[in-house]
């Protein structure tokens, strides 16, 4: 059961559809308060039963696998055209080591190359770090290019250590990664 008080002061609700009913409840409360919705569509996670959650979101950051299954296309441009429909304000399709592609509703887009993790130790949590870093930039009203670069760089840094929270570890309290 979603507790509406969790949205007090929120500017964005980030959902992934994993707990569908809770996500729907949270989404309804966020919509009633005009809170922006972001959606995380991970690889292997698309299901028709969560399409409504995806389609209600404003900021859509999804893996290429999710984008292909949700759009029914394997062509990147065709996928984007289908997935950037209103109310979307932004679409990001991630491709891991091949970087990410960022689209605006007017169909302008760019490719953000991935940063190389050296050494590459563990990719656990890199997608979550990418999402969090990108959304930090989005909420800070950074240019999209800066959001994408920052997210890509921070995700690569996460892969240089063990576990999904490497970049948040006490051994590395600050990362001078802002561009």
Which positions does each model-derived feature cover?
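Ribokinase/PfkB-type carbohydrate-kinase core domain
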Residues: 1-110, 142, 170
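Conserved phosphate-binding/catalytic region of the ribokinase-like
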Residues: 12, 74-179
């Amino acid at each position: 059961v979603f507790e509406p008080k969790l949205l007090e002061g929120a500017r964005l609700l980030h959902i992934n559809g994993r707990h569908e009913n809770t996500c729907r409840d949270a989404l309804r409360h966020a919509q009633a308060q005009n809170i922006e919705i972001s959606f995380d569509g991970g690889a292997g996670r698309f299901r028709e039963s969560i399409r409504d959650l995806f389609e209600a979101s404003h900021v859509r950051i999804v893996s290429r696998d999710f984008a292909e299954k949700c759009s029914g296309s394997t062509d990147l441009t065709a996928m984007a055209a289908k997935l950037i429909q209103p109310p979307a304000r932004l679409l990001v399709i991630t491709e891991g080591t091949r970087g990410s592609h960022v689209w605006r509703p007017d169909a302008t887009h760019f490719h953000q190359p991935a940063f190389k993790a050296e050494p590459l130790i563990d990719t656990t949590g890199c997608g979550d770090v990418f999402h969090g870093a990108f959304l930090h930039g989005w909420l800070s009203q950074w240019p999209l290019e800066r959001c994408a670069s920052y997210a890509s760089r921070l995700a690569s840094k996460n892969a240089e250590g063990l576990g999904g929270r490497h970049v948040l570890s006490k051994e590395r309290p600050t990362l001078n990664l802002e561009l």
